[in-house]
Amino acid sequence: MKIYRVGGSVRDELLGLPVKDQDYVVVGATPEEMVRLGYRPVGKDFPVFLHPETHEQYALARTERKIARGYKGFEVYAAPGVTLQEDLARRDLTINAMARDEAGDIVDPFGGIADLQAGILRHIGPAFVEDPVRVLRVARFAARFGFQIAPETLELMKEIVHTGETEALVPERVWQEIAHGLMESHPSRMFYVLRECGALARILPEVDALFGVPQPAHAHPEIDTGIHVMMVIDHAASKQYPLEVRFAGLTHDLGKGTTSPDEWPRHIGHEARSVELVMGLCERIRVPGESRDLALLVARFHGDVHRALELRPATIADMLQATDAYRKKARFQAFLQACASDFHGRPGFADKPYPQKEHLSRALQVAVDVDAGAIAMQLNQSHAGKADLPMRINRQVYAARVERISSLLSHL
């Protein structure tokens, strides 16, 4: 029985990056032996065990054989006779197929170290095409490390897309990989790779449709809507904004992809169209509620936020109400972060001031200080009829908030 540390932890260690999760492969053991040694079985599809003390994962060496479409269509074979090299050979990329033995020596049968040094993402063998998730993973690694994709690997990615394997991806896995990619330091790289191999048009056609759609040059020097959206998510990443903000940045302009070419470069009404497309995309790939809800708000209101300095107090109060800012203050700040990223995501705009963000934050601050409870109590004591009391309370609270915002703006 021999134990090897494998995969991402070995890769990251060689790159000088922090090592998070550590995975191990056990060669020459049976499930019964592992249990006798105190390991706890947890794997459903293949033998995986948790270490009795560290609780890290230890998997028996295994091979896989494709028997059906999709990333779950594999038959797994695990036995004491499976070698380390056979186990490593089933992995996706050379940089992920290295191991470190108990003496600390590196086992690198496929040239992973050389590819790390050269900054290359290269597949191991022809079995790469059997798992469509690998298209998403390679794109994500490109965003993480900034590595180039080997030409032959890119060709196999195109083959996976062409054969329709990506259609078999379950929605939850698509979202999982997209979310991971958005959280990388340069998320745009993931989407450019997906577009280059044809996968973006299959899994996120609404985003793919943005490329080649022009915008007014005076407001968008980058012209291309797809490029703009990529700049938006990269700006959000540079500010280390959370996933919800980055996803909202990715989807805020989806409606521009449906503008008739006769109307280019203007996109009148694209906000309403964006809302509809965001909802459909979120339903299709099972986007969690927090990311979906923020994306819908940003799609609908980002134009109003950009015009915030010109808005009347009542219009600002209406926006605060419509975005549920009084109850969800943290989400409203994320909303403003996404709108600011939209502004900054243009050539030459990264360091320009965006006073709208502070303007609306201060408006919320003064409006939220209105004591709705005191207003309700006063009306309850002075108003004989109770039938329309809730409506009267809402009107008074709204009026008080508008007055507070108006007072604020008069002093700016």
From Swiss-Prot:
The residue ranges of the HD domain are 225-326
Q: Where does CTP bind?
A: G8, R11, R91, R137, R140
Keywords of the record, alphabetical order, are: ATP-binding, Hydrolase, Magnesium, Metal-binding, Multifunctional enzyme, Nickel, Nucleotide-binding, Nucleotidyltransferase, RNA repair, RNA-binding, Transferase, tRNA processing
* Residues binding Mg(2+), per UniProt: D21, D23
Name the cofactor(s) required for activity, per the record: Mg(2+); Ni(2+)
Checking InterPro entries in the record gives:
CCA_bact (IPR012006), HD/PDEase_dom (IPR003607), HD_domain (IPR006674), NT_sf (IPR043519), PolA_pol_head_dom (IPR002646), PolyA_RNA-bd (IPR032828), tRNA_CCA-adding_enzyme (IPR050124)
Comment on bound cofactor: Magnesium is required for nucleotidyltransferase activity.
List, alphabetically, the Pfam families matched.
HD, PolyA_pol, PolyA_pol_RNAbd
Q: Where does ATP bind?
A: G8, R11, R91, R137, R140
List its EC numbers: 2.7.7.72, 3.1.3.-, 3.1.4.-
GO molecular function, one example? Answer: ATP binding
PROSITE patterns referenced in this protein's UniProt entry, alphabetically: HD
Q: According to its UniProt record, which reaction does this protein catalyse?
A: a tRNA precursor + 2 CTP + ATP = a tRNA with a 3' CCA end + 3 diphosphate; a tRNA with a 3' CCA end + 2 CTP + ATP = a tRNA with a 3' CCACCA end + 3 diphosphate
Q: Name one GO biological process term.
A: tRNA 3'-terminal CCA addition
Q: How does it assemble?
A: Monomer. Can also form homodimers and oligomers.
Q: Which PANTHER family match?
A: MULTIFUNCTIONAL CCA PROTEIN
The record's note on its domains = Comprises two domains: an N-terminal domain containing the nucleotidyltransferase activity and a C-terminal HD domain associated with both phosphodiesterase and phosphatase activities.
Function, as annotated, reads: Catalyzes the addition and repair of the essential 3'-terminal CCA sequence in tRNAs without using a nucleic acid template. Adds these three nucleotides in the order of C, C, and A to the tRNA nucleotide-73, using CTP and ATP as substrates and producing inorganic pyrophosphate. tRNA 3'-terminal CCA addition is required both for tRNA processing and repair. Also involved in tRNA surveillance by mediating tandem CCA addition to generate a CCACCA at the 3' terminus of unstable tRNAs. While stable tRNAs receive only 3'-terminal CCA, unstable tRNAs are marked with CCACCA and rapidly degraded.
Q: Which family does it belong to?
A: Belongs to the tRNA nucleotidyltransferase/poly(A) polymerase family. Bacterial CCA-adding enzyme type 1 subfamily.
| Remaining remarks | A single active site specifically recognizes both ATP and CTP and is responsible for their addition.
Q: What is this protein called?
A: Multifunctional CCA protein
Organism source for this protein? Nitrosomonas europaea (strain ATCC 19718 / CIP 103999 / KCTC 2705 / NBRC 14298)
